[in-house]
Amino acid sequence: MRILSSDFISKYFGKILNIHPSLLPKFPGLNTHQKAIESSEKIHGASVHFVTVKLDGGPVISKETVSIDPTDDVTTLAKKVLQKEHILYPKVIQWYTQKRLKLIDESTATLDGRVL
C-alpha cells in the first residue's frame, strides 16, 4: 500500500480508483481481514472507491461481499476477498472507461448520472 500526496490526488482528482479489502467505511487502512475476524463480523468483502485526500474515505462505487465462516482465518478470508476483487475491479474500471463514473466532490460520485 502506498499513501499518495494530497498534491498528487488533487492533480488527478476523479481519475484515481482504489480497490480496498473491506466493506468501506468499515476497516480503512491495513489488516482489514484480521480486524473483521476480531470484530466477529459475519460478512466481509471488497470495495472500489474514488481516491480522495482522506485515506480510504472517497465515495464508494461498488462492493462485493463474502461470508466469514467460523473456520476462516486471515489467510482463507483474504483468498475469498481476493476472488471477489478480481470480479469487482474490472467491472468498475469498465464503467470508468465508458465514462459512466464521475467524482463530483470529496464525498459524492455518480454512476450513469445517479448519485452512488
Language model region names:
Residues L116:
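Phosphate-binding loop/pocket of nucleotide- and phosphate-handling active sites
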